[in-house]
Amino acid sequence: MSKRPADIVISTPASKVRRKLNFNSPFKSAAAVPTVRVTRRRTWVNRPMYRKPMMYRLFRSPDVPRGCEGPCKVQSYEQRHDVAHVGKVLCVSDVTRGTGITHRTGKRFCIKSIYVLGKIWMDDNIKTRNHTNTVMFFLVRDRRPYGTPKDFGQVFNMYDNEPSTATVKNDMRDGFQVIKKWSATVTGGQYASKEQAIINRFYKIYNHCTYNHQEAAKYENHTENALLLYMACTHASNPVYATLKIRIYFYDSIQN
């Protein structure tokens, strides 16, 4: 049986180009959509672990950040905060110099990740009012810390003093960088009330902090890259409370 000529197949309007669909490899199908510098490593980064090849399951990225040395150290900040409409700031890179598992050995260390755990809640007098209150959280890197941490209104520019529209001021964008941003909402009232909201956030940030020669864990002893957590609620007259446990996981630098 003779085959059809190749030119007839191409010129026929009803003919379609048959392709072999391969759903196993996102790297081969990445050529269909033009992307910027698609590497084989990046194509598998957003896949679940059971769908990755064996090579990407066994050989993972190193746990210790570049330029640092183990072991992984932990520092916790546990406090109840009164979050107001004007905002509040908390320094989460205060680490004392020492030899323990919660201390820094020298001036430099790298905060690899941060874990924010807790809840926001209202007291009994406020939760009976019909309102909705959202707490905005901003994890900010202060590249050039000096003196005391700046207030929320000094760093962020807001429209009509509304924290939900907060962006870093134009003259502050070089010194203050928002690393992560999230929010949590509580609702008060007699019906359909939600008096508390759980906060469970884990982020990899790789923030390289630098201290001066002082040993105390203070903001004023930072010289580079202090880590600040800004909080502000959207309701002007009804405050909200935040009970948080913040843990940072850091490694000492080999330059110490």
UniProtKB/Swiss-Prot annotation:
Keyword S-adenosyl-L-methionine: no
Disulfide bonds: none
GO cellular component: host cell; host cell nucleus; T=1 icosahedral viral capsid
Keywords annotated in UniProt: Capsid protein, DNA-binding, Host nucleus, Metal-binding, T=1 icosahedral capsid protein, Viral penetration into host nucleus, Virion, Virus entry into host cell, Zinc, Zinc-finger
Signal peptide: none
Keyword presence, Heme: no
UniProt motif (Nuclear export signal) ranges: 101-122
InterPro entries assigned: Gem_coat_AR1, GV_A/BR1_coat, Viral_coat
Residues spanned by motif Nuclear localization signal: 40-54
UniProt-recorded name of the protein: Capsid protein
One MF annotation (Gene Ontology) recorded for this entry: zinc ion binding
